[in-house]
Each structure stands twice: as C-alpha cells, then as structure tokens.
Design a protein with these regions (language model features):
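Thiamine diphosphate
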Residues: 1-93
Length: 93
C-alpha cells in the first residue's frame, strides 16, 4: 500500500471523479489558478477548465449555498473550504 498524505490522496481522487463524471465540479476560494491553499486542486483548472473548477469570492456561505443548490439539480459539487473554522459561517445555508 502506498504511503501518502491526505492531499496526495485527495487530488487524484478529485481528478478521477471529474474524469469519470462530467457533473462533478469544484468550487472554492483560490481553487483554480492557485490550486487551493494546500494545493489540493493544483492542475485541475488547467485540465478541466474554468467552468468546472471555479474560483469563488471570500464567502463561505455562498460556496455552501451554490454547492447545495447545484446538488439539488443533479450536479456533484465539491465545495472546498480552506479551513474547518471557515465552515461555521456556511451553516446558515
């Protein structure tokens, strides 16, 4: 079994799901060009484009709201919140 960090496991898992299912997309702060604060989405925007790897404003409640709404319509969003503490503002969604 390969030994890897969480980030090393998450990145290829997201890529594999995005290749397998066109309904999967990623949204969050700096997930596109910068590849996320920890690099979890590095290279995904180059591979899948800006429509499937979306940089969002600094608004966790908006990220959660968009993800919830997209899921209600059959899409498969991956909402990236930079830090666990930042999820609390999203709970009102």
């Amino acid at each position: 079994m390969a030994v890897m960090t969480y980030i090393q496991a998450i990145t290829p898992a997201m890529r594999d799901e995005m290749e397998r299912d066109e309904r999967v997309f990623v949204l969050g702060e700096d997930v596109g060009v910068k590849g996320g604060v920890f690099g979890a989405t590095k290279g995904l925007q180059e591979r899948f484009g800006e429509l499937r790897v979306l940089d969002t404003p600094l608004a966790e409640s908006a990220i959660a709201g968009v993800a919830i709404g997209a899921a209600m319509y059959g899409l498969r969003p991956i909402a990236e919140m930079q830090y666990s503490d930042f999820m609390f503002p999203a709970t009102n969604q």
